[in-house]
């Protein structure tokens, strides 16, 4: 590309990083890195009443956690700042005045009540999509001066050209056409409080920051003609647009922040012990697909392969099961030290282990986490997975009860119990040898041998490697559970 690629992700600090925002940020990032360009994070904080405390910090921290190492923002000046819209108000004012002077914009003194009456009258007349009548468009300079002298509040509206067609090429959708009559009439570019509206400020920012490409959600598609009007009035070249398809839930309904069937914020996945590299991989496949069947890719591979022509034109389903599966694939290959960092805090938080562990307790916890590395889908899952190690008395699953009711069980368990009592040291290797001895003594092997022992000491018929699980349970607990299984009637 001849022009340097500069993209932007522009979150509002009215909330934390949502999965939809994360996907948008990621596609901007992949495109920029693929073309050797720059990614800018601009904070669109003009909706002051809705901004939440810590929202800005949370957005940036979660982007960095995901591995989106942007080039310019409020914490990384690149010479195109300020990067907060509330710090750019003087800049917007300059361009608003230019439009007023050129006659492309005007002051509107209509009150909210007058505007509502206008809309109601249009609806009563059968107009489905009411438009602003433009009555303040024709005020004379003298009338404007008089209304201002009376202290009447006003907004500033952009004059919408009549009978004009706006056409642009979208990198996802191809040719898109809008008519000027469909934007709702002359629209507000500056609110009564002096703050510019989104569709005006975003054009000024994108132009001055030399943004070359805009990747954003399809909900912004209807904003595009308004923005093109501003570009045209200033004689500026607009960026190339790519409107990403909706993210839908498993019922194929548009993802709503009120939908409690899906965890929707990146920080929540982080708290649950998901891995950033797995989340990065998953988000990359949410509306984009590489060639072939492979689904696990490193960040560098995704950057190298990213091609806008493979962005989907259909809604993307947020498949929680797939994310959990993908995270498990990453956990299986994870360095044990990092897995311990991920999972151990959850055992402490659940009260399973003390915060100030001894070296012996820490080693035991490390061995426990290693035992479940293949099964664990996310860090917090260690708590339910390992529950049997912390219970005083286990509950037997139905399948375990069926196994323990088999006729060979008393002989297997009593023989194993005798071996366990004498076992020193109580290690996985010694336990393996003891189970082998039970096989020799009872003639039982395979499931008839292992299943009763597993069912008796864990209450389950499936689980981690048995000799290691028995070692971690400890001799005393194993003896208690074997004795109970021999006494209980199944």
UniProtKB/Swiss-Prot annotation:
Catalytic activity: tRNA(Glu) + L-glutamate + ATP = L-glutamyl-tRNA(Glu) + AMP + diphosphate
Motif 'HIGH' region, residue numbers: 11-21
Subcellular localization: Cytoplasm
Binding positions for ATP per the UniProt entry: 257
UniProt keyword list: Aminoacyl-tRNA synthetase, ATP-binding, Cytoplasm, Ligase, Metal-binding, Nucleotide-binding, Protein biosynthesis, Zinc
Assembly and binders: Monomer.
Organism annotation: Geobacillus kaustophilus (strain HTA426)
Pfam families reported in the protein's UniProt record: Anticodon_2, tRNA-synt_1c
UniProt record, GO biological process: glutamyl-tRNA aminoacylation
UniProt cofactor note: Binds 1 zinc ion per subunit.
Function: Catalyzes the attachment of glutamate to tRNA(Glu) in a two-step reaction: glutamate is first activated by ATP to form Glu-AMP and then transferred to the acceptor end of tRNA(Glu).
Recorded name of the encoding gene: gltX
Cofactors (names): Zn(2+)
GO cellular component: cytosol
EC numbers for this chain: 6.1.1.17
GO molecular function: ATP binding; glutamate-tRNA ligase activity; tRNA binding; zinc ion binding
Residue span of motif 'KMSKS' region: 254-258
Positions annotated to bind Zn(2+): 108, 110, 136, 138
Principal subcellular localization: cytoplasm
Protein name: Glutamate--tRNA ligase
Family membership: Belongs to the class-I aminoacyl-tRNA synthetase family. Glutamate--tRNA ligase type 1 subfamily.
């Amino acid at each position: 590309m001849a022009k340097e690629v500069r993209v932007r992700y522009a979150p509002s600090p009215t909330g934390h990083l949502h999965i939809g925002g994360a996907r948008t940020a990621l596609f901007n990032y992949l495109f920029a890195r693929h073309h050797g360009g720059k990614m800018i994070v601009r904070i669109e904080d003009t909706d002051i009443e809705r901004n939440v405390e810590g929202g800005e910090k949370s957005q940036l921290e979660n982007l960095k956690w995901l591995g989106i190492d942007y080039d310019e923002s409020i914490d990384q000046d690149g010479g195109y700042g300020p990067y907060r819209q509330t710090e750019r108000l003087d800049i917007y004012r300059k361009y608003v005045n230019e439009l007023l002077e050129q006659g492309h914009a005007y002051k509107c003194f209509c009150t909210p009540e007058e505007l509502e009456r206008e809309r109601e009258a249009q609806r009563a007349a059968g107009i489905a999509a009411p438009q602003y009548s433009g009555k303040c468009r024709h005020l004379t300079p003298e009338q404007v001066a008089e209304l201002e002298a009376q202290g009447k509040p006003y907004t500033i509206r952009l004059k919408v050209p009549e009978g004009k067609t706006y056409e642009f090429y979208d990198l996802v959708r191809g040719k898109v056409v809008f008519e000027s009559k469909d934007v709702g009439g002359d629209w507000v570019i500056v609110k009564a409080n002096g703050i510019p509206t989104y569709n005006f400020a975003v054009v000024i920012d994108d132009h001055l920051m030399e943004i070359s490409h805009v990747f954003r959600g399809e909900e912004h598609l209807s904003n595009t003609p308004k923005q093109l009007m501003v570009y045209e009035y200033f004689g500026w070249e607009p960026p190339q647009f790519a409107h990403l398809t909706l993210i839908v839930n498993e019922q194929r309904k548009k993802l709503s922040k009120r939908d409690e069937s899906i965890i929707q914020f990146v920080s929540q996945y982080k708290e649950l012990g998901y891995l950033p590299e797995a989340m990065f991989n998953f988000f990359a496949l949410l509306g984009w697909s590489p060639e072939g069947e492979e689904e696990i890719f490193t960040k560098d591979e995704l950057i190298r392969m990213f091609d806008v022509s493979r962005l989907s034109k259909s809604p993307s389903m947020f498949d929680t099961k797939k994310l959990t599966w993908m995270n498990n694939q990453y956990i299986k290959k994870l360095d044990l030290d990092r897995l311990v960092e991920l999972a151990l805090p959850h055992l402490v938080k659940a009260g399973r282990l003390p915060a100030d562990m001894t070296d012996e307790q820490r080693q035991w916890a490390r061995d426990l986490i290693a035992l479940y590395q293949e099964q664990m889908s996310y860090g917090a899952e260690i708590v339910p997975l390992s529950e049997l190690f912390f219970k005083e008395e286990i509950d037997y699953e139905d399948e375990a009860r069926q196994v323990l009711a088999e006729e060979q069980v008393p002989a297997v368990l009593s023989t194993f119990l005798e071996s366990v009592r004498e076992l020193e040291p109580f290690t996985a290797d010694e336990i393996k040898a003891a189970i082998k001895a039970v096989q020799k003594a009872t003639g039982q092997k395979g499931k008839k041998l292992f299943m009763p022992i597993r069912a008796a000491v864990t209450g389950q018929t499936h689980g981690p490697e048995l000799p290691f699980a028995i070692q971690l349970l400890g001799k005393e607990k194993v003896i208690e559970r074997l004795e109970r299984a021999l006494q209980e009637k199944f």
